[in-house]
């Protein structure tokens, strides 16, 4: 049992181990999706965050939920991140196997990109920084007076609140 648990933990690590001197300082400017990769959130949550991001930016709309089918808008809006463009490219693909391969490729590129951006910065300090952004996002939602304002704040801070490991339960508590 102990071996199975330790093997599972090892599989959860996205960022490759590196032997180097830890940098110092906070890496600012990461997106919520990149912060999720840094926090080693489950990949299904990261994919959901990317999906919500492209929908919010009007780059795609959901046609069917199960299996997930997207209608990618044309022309694409400006300001999409590389991982969002790769995500949309994958969903333009009709063949399920090719789509899965493109999504896997997108994920690997995203992880490498985050790893590259973190060079020279303190992982520990950066994690604490993005944890505090997530907490501030929740505080804004919780501080809202009316359900309408609460929903609006939640929509605005969705990507950051999703970083919470307790996202589902906390969302239920906030909107009770």
Give, region by region, the residue ranges found by the protein language model:
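Acidic, Ser/Thr/Pro-rich intrinsically disordered cytosolic tails and loops
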Residues: 1-176
